[in-house]
């Protein structure tokens, strides 16, 4: 019998509807996977991560330094389990689901980083995810003692200057190679990423993947998840309205666009949004005039078979 709750969306809402610092990141991440794999056993998956943390703890024994901890996590994840960053199929959605990462041994930067942080936590160490533009790392330690780890590159260590170079390349200033970005300029990009932001970034990656595949049913699930994590995200509301329209859910799309217009910054494609809202309302009127019927049922259940190990 599965230990995954039937009302996954309700449980996910409860898990993320607390102050960001109190969010159980592993539970929330597993619930994201459970929306795709409703037969997944969340208790068992938590147990897998706990066992990995215990293996790290045993490796450390009497050693307690940060480098010792990083080395131990690296050994367990990348040597024992053989986990790697998926550089061939980077945008495979399975790379975003922790159970898939453990099953297949492949993941993307943010999911590998979440797994890294959660394993370290269960071994007694507080590491942080660092969401650089275009990449995701793990930081062990604080201030000048910080160690930067790249789980996507089998736990390779990076200097602060190498991290700054990643930021500089990502924000489009390659012309400044001869004038490197300063530590102060890069500092806002190198702060620990909050749990809510990590979840939003994970879901945003998935949303983009499904939109590119034109898999609007799955994209809808993910966009609804982002709305749960960050209800005020106007960018996600715009995407959500588009997805609802693609699925023929014109009433829902009109409501979403109305909310978007109330929240989006002035001048941000508001005229096109107003035109889209007017067209949606006309569609709703025509639909009512043509006969009974409502928008398709809401989300909440599985959106199709997607074997974890195919």
Q: Predicted regions span which residues?
A:
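A structural boundary/capping signal
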Residues: 1-310
